[in-house]
Amino acid sequence: MSRPVPKPGILDIAPYTPGKSPVPEAGRKVFKLSANETPFGPSPHAIAAYKSAADHLEDYPEGTSRVLREAIGRAYGLDPDRIICGAGSDEILNLLAHTYLGPGDEAISSQHGFLVYPIATLANGATNVVAPEKDLTTDVDAILSKVTPNTKLVWLANPNNPTGTYIPFDEVKRLRAGLPSHVVLVLDAAYADYVSKNDYEIGIELVSTTDNTVLTHTFSKVHGLASLRIGWMFGPANIVDAVNRIRGPFNTSIPAQLAAVAAIQDTAHVDMSRVHTEKWRDRLTEEFTKLGLTVTPSVCNFVLMHFPTTAGKTAADADAFLTKRGLVLRALGNYKLPHALRMTIGTDEANELVIAALTEFMAKP
């Protein structure tokens, strides 16, 4: 008997594996430090706005997320008509791939880039082309060397997850200048709110002055609205028009829209998170380096640490040791970083516990 067969290439896609979600155990506190979630939660104003939506759950949302687009426009100085909102920036990444990629096309991503990129590429029948990195950092020349007449899209996470590295805005502009004009450059700025480097820019200037570059962002990270799945894209009118033609008519919920509007207006809550992140990013890097671990310099709300390959001291050993103590980090074998763990910057308590636990782990004979 025959059965339905997926399109060619679908079963070749490795499913996305999220960070572990710990199972609570009686008598033990568990800290989830595997998914880059904020330890502060959402703004209280966002929570209040979310609760207010409970009185209107029978209503369809406004289909274009107009109020949220206008709030984003005010916050960033953007034209709301050039903004699209989605169920997380993940949905928008998939919409872009669905709009611009098909069989015979190629999309380029960096060696340790976000795993949604190859999934979105392959799901649309296109070829995923990987550009090598330099010191776990996007290499513009490597990307440009991979361009062929079949290249239709380039994914650029800046800063990048899971490495925590970034490239200066001058390098982003050099990349755009080196790409053919028909290639869409996607600037994924999910972690932009945590970057304090003077040579970094989110990319608004580039999007505003070209017709082939888009910027995506999310409310899941610094705004703490990950469970609501809400994100956005700023792009040229031609790309916005094309993507809107296949976007679902009610793809963001009323609770998500209202919470996001309140979140983007609460700049004090965002600033608090930034200060906490910067303080602990420096401290954790220093402490882990003292233990003999190699820590990749990060500009995000997480740190990437590399472990020895010696039996008993590997990343897998450390992961098991920490998990038994209720400290859940992210193993990165699926990112081809089998000797590394990524730690979300958590509460003061969680961070201190990880330092103490890794100190004990590294001191073991």
From Swiss-Prot:
Alphabetized InterPro entries for the sequence: Aminotransferase_I/II_large, HisP_aminotrans, HistidinolP_aminotransfase, PyrdxlP-dep_Trfase, PyrdxlP-dep_Trfase_major, PyrdxlP-dep_Trfase_small
Pfam families named in the record: Aminotran_1_2 (PF00155)
Top-level class of the enzyme under EC nomenclature: transferase
Pathway listed: Amino-acid biosynthesis; L-histidine biosynthesis; L-histidine from 5-phospho-alpha-D-ribose 1-diphosphate: step 7/9
Catalytic activity: L-histidinol phosphate + 2-oxoglutarate = 3-(imidazol-4-yl)-2-oxopropyl phosphate + L-glutamate
SUPFAM superfamilies cross-referenced by the UniProt entry: PLP-dependent transferases
GO annotation (BP), single: L-histidine biosynthetic process
Enzyme Commission code: 2.6.1.9
Any one GO molecular function term: pyridoxal phosphate binding
Keywords: Amino-acid biosynthesis, Aminotransferase, Histidine biosynthesis, Pyridoxal phosphate, Transferase
UniProt cofactor(s): pyridoxal 5'-phosphate
Source organism superkingdom: Bacteria
Modification type N6-(pyridoxal phosphate)lysine: residues: K221
Subunit-structure text: Homodimer.
Family that this chain belongs to: Belongs to the class-II pyridoxal-phosphate-dependent aminotransferase family. Histidinol-phosphate aminotransferase subfamily.
Protein known as: Histidinol-phosphate aminotransferase
Origin species: Rhodopseudomonas palustris (strain HaA2)
UniProt lineage: Bacteria, Pseudomonadati, Pseudomonadota, Alphaproteobacteria, Hyphomicrobiales
Gene transcribed to yield this protein: hisC
